[in-house]
């Protein structure tokens, strides 16, 4: 360290011009400090170069004396390089490669020969050769706006242009690089301009990197510096130049074969490769790979496919990739600077986030611009709409406003904007004066005022070296040097930018997750046993045992099974089935007898047991009864309807037999279709289909002939034929908690509320066999509801629903009962006529004895079927269908009870008995009107159905207003209502019949009113059946 530098370090003026302000950094061969040019009034960077220890042996005064001018040296140098290349090719350069020291000496001589004599004359002999070589290169470059200018050099000092923004590396590390597309393009364009300029000069940098790119001013003016490794050779054999991460692939011997290693590389192509890496640093702040050879996997991926850059930089836009296509190519011949510039001009965005960053600060900048003073009014000679051009005589430098610069520090932004506003205001309102302007050094700080500092100089206070501390400088961020005794900082000492490895953390995550080995397949998948049993094996045939348990057949060693258990708890008359099989009872019909070999009639029995502590479990225990309780209002299939079986098995024992078809009941031969349907249905084992509840199969008689296990005794109590040919009904009910059975006799009127459901009488002959093993049964669908007081009518004789005798004696065993029966038979035989339908509410409930029907009765092809839907309802009372007040109709369910006759509109209720429903194809059955009804005298074949409900005002409108003790009824004429058929038929019938007068006098409701509702119901049913067919 010389005495001059000691004085300069302590605050003295160097060379009578430069005064030190502060230290900036330490280089590999000197110190860099910030100084003030007292002559030019500007800030400069002073680089002090000291001599290395091993340079003395190659340097001496004798070398300077033998130096020639620059032109001669260049010629000699070229000749020397050619000679050396020729000798290397012929193998005569063994003496030059004898030792590394000798090789280094030859290189030193070659570099020293390149330095011009003017540079050597102004520099000291004690400085290093690299400094002299760099000064010589910069003197050849000249001045350019994007190259750091060499202002002065003398002795061991080099004076260079000061760039207040620091280098690009520090800006990238501080995330101070602007992210707008226009700003990035401005930076990249300046770098390309500088490289293109020096390449046109025949100079190649060979060490382009962010550390060698400086930032000058607030407008992000780029300055390229550090020309120590630059060369003027178009091609070179020296491959050990540059920074590792920015070196092109051809600079690494491992990427070359033996032949390629002997060939020189193009120095211009090396700069283009480094430019592409720097562009990625500016945009993404990362390097694509650490080194461009085979040791880097990222580079290997890139060498195989250039689009691998999208894997490293996922947000890179394709336009930016097009720019890099002419820079980052393995083949140097494909690198083209002109194509890079062309693609850069066509670029719209660098990343997918540019749109966000472009709109980020627009609002703030617009408000700052709006605060500027208005522009002055131009002269009258110039158009008002156009701005006035600056006169050539006025060399005033108008400041430019750059939106592209982005400071992290808000205070810096505000101070810079304030200084700009002040300068702009002074420029607008002050007259340009040439006397106050001076121009220096071909464009460096050309606009300076005598009373103000340069615009590029930061505003801060100057302090002495001994009072060094933090300054108020807000613009420059120099590297502070506080410890003088620290070791020298080498040129490549700063850590390079990082490498993005997007897959590394993902791989580590999966490796760590796998290392824990906590994954268990059973935690995420269903075990095979569960899959087979509950999912795949649900409908297999191997699951029959499971279905039997669900259908209340527990055959597992006669043990109780919770799945097949049924708990009946008395809760407001409703029964609930506990357990998960409740849904199966509701939605699935029970299996047929094909599983157990037993008849469904023996499995599905009815028992009314409301005890809280009683439970029944299939066939698990002897002597126990099986009950299947259904919710009120739910449809019960015929083969699943319950039977009345008392716990003692004394009453209502239903034999196991198949129901006969309709032809057998009526005494005729079955047709071919009926016989075929019967055989086909007998061959089928399982009727376990829930898809069709009311739909019948092929023929019209399938519901009669095809259903096995149908019995007339499904809802029929056990009948006992008395001495007077009267049938008594026995029902077993248990409504008490003590389990006592109450034997109900239909002859007693005290227990009339406990009457059981009895099917309606048939007009055909029905013979009951007292033998328990043999009986002829009819299907449930052929049964019609009757009142709870009614006996089973087994007589085939005519029935007269309208009697003038003492009807009240029917409910008691009086002595004149036989006489009344004889009178009724005679009257019915006289009124007997074919084709008359007996409504359910008009049928007799007394057994008139097993009597041979009249000769004119057709019993072989006709049967009576009830279509009444609400003959038996679930509720609190009987469904009253009003008739005459004095003469009660015995076939009306509610009129037999005098207590209920006073409650009009009440609904009938039979606890625990389901509603009989009309089958889907009921219209296909025989519904011919019989002669033994009230329409025996009529000459029409009208089919009359019973109305569903008559309550409230509707009963009054249809049946007239009831008055106590009055035998008159308000009858309407046939012409005043809608009748299904010709009106003449009904008019003649009611006009020519004398029986309707007696009926109108004896009943409140006329027959015509009965027909209105019946025909309406028939039409509705007929329309439904037509839609279903």
Swiss-Prot record:
Positions with biased composition (Basic and acidic residues): 80-89, 813-824, 953-964
The entry's keywords: ATP-binding, Kinase, Nucleotide-binding, Nucleus, Phosphoprotein, Serine/threonine-protein kinase, Transferase
Keyword Lyase: no
Enzyme active site: 207 (proton acceptor)
GO biological process terms, semicolon-separated: G2/M transition of mitotic cell cycle; negative regulation of macroautophagy; protein localization; regulation of filamentous growth; regulation of pseudohyphal growth; regulation of translation in response to stress; TOR signaling
Start-end of Polar residues biased regions: 744-754
Catalytic activity field: L-seryl-[protein] + ATP = O-phospho-L-seryl-[protein] + ADP + H(+); L-threonyl-[protein] + ATP = O-phospho-L-threonyl-[protein] + ADP + H(+)
Biased composition (Low complexity): 90-99, 538-570, 734-743
One annotated GO molecular function: protein kinase activity
Modified residue annotations for Phosphothreonine: 501, 504, 526, 1005
EC number from the UniProt entry: 2.7.11.1
GO (cellular component) term, any one: cytoplasmic stress granule
Positions of post-translational Phosphoserine modification: 416, 419, 529, 646, 845, 884, 1014
CDD domains xrefs: STKc_Pat1_like (cd13993)
Keyword Transferase part of the UniProt annotation: yes
Residue ranges of every copy of the Protein kinase domain listed in the record: 18-351
InterPro entries: Atg1-like (IPR045269), Kinase-like_dom_sf (IPR011009), Prot_kinase_dom (IPR000719), Ser/Thr_kinase_AS (IPR008271)
Family the UniProt entry places it in: Belongs to the protein kinase superfamily. Ser/Thr protein kinase family. CK2 subfamily.
Misc. remarks from the entry: Present with 1270 molecules/cell in log phase SD medium.
UniProt function note: May act on PRP20.
The protein, known as: Serine/threonine-protein kinase KSP1
Source organism per UniProt: Saccharomyces cerevisiae (strain ATCC 204508 / S288c)
